[in-house]
Amino acid sequence: MKYVLIQATDNGILRRAECGGAVTALFKYLLDKKLVDGVLALKRGEDVYDGIPTFITNSNELVETAGSLHCAPTNFGKLIAKYLADKKIAVPAKPCDAMAIRELAKLNQINLDNVYMIGLNCGGTISPITAMKMIELFYEVNPLDVVKEEIDKGKFIIELKNGEHKAVKIEELEEKGFGRRKNCQRCEIMIPRMADLACGNWGAEKGWTFVEICSERGRKLVEDAEKDGYIKIKQPSEKAIQVREKIESIMIKLAKKFQKKHLEEEYPSLEKWKKYWNRCIKCYGCRDNCPLCFCVECSLEKDYIEEKGKIPPNPLIFQGIRLSHISQSCINCGQCEDACPMDIPLAYIFHRMQLKIRDTLGYIPGVDNSLPPLFNIER
């Protein structure tokens, strides 16, 4: 049993959740059976552009986290390592979440035995500011009137307060400089097979979640949750499996196309990079937001490096140190770029460097248990 279709048996979950409610139902099972201390999930805040990481210990509150929030990109890796390392938890994990968690585990920051990862297939996320501008421009509505959004069949779909639905092809949005975040456009890992389960709507029947079982723990979770009546399962058709594989293949080809565009054809010149680095105000947002930056004592704050009062900082020192520390483990989550108030395209250089390491040494961060290259050198 590698692939299954799953549907929640709880009507409340079915009404609120996406495509069958499998993820929420499995979290409810884990909490009710006290297999975890809590679930770290994203809860909607003021609107669809505001996602709040929330640690839930009462299964009745899980339904508040059901549904998608594509316009509130975040990463759970650092939150787990910093605040929940001693807890047994479950987490909904996009590929970059799962990669960060697994990479941090290699660096002894997270104990994977304490983390159930329910993976979420991901075709990309949209920054909240971009989303609001995009909705106003292309959908011709007030962004604050949007009550729900989803990505389906290559379209970004919104639902308004009056129940009206509007959709635009993502390809059209991205041709105009909107749509998914640039790092998401380049990402070729859409199915989080490094998690215990990988869940999504690709190939799924209406009202069901298509689930790929990726670990023995994931298999046992599905079997036990079905036995105790939390979910219903059935086998997907061969055609459904093929549809899912085809969608993944198309998305990977598109990602490679964007990699070539961003990291080769449009990659900034040295002169352009100098202009970017001169914008830096040394706010440390890139470091603080990076899920793989975890040192208690940061090299960037050493007296002999910090150059107190100097803005912009020397890029060979400031960003050079970050590159040497992070590039081998960069998961292309884009959090550094999102945090930068000066719009420096940081993910370009980090992702480009990681791809060179991948192509040279064969190392892909966060997909398996192999150590990063600098930790795995033979004398």
UniProtKB/Swiss-Prot annotation:
[4Fe-4S] cluster 2 binds at C290, C330, C333, C336. Pfam families: Fer4, FrhB_FdhB_C, FrhB_FdhB_N. Residues 271-301, 321-351 form the 4Fe-4S ferredoxin-type domain. It catalyses: oxidized coenzyme F420-(gamma-L-Glu)(n) + formate + 2 H(+) = reduced coenzyme F420-(gamma-L-Glu)(n) + CO2. It is an enzyme of class 1 (oxidoreductase). PANTHER family: 7-HYDROXYMETHYL CHLOROPHYLL A REDUCTASE, CHLOROPLASTIC, FORMATE DEHYDROGENASE SUBUNIT BETA. Dimer of an alpha (FdhA) and a beta (FdhB) subunit. This is F420-dependent formate dehydrogenase subunit beta. The gene is fdhB.
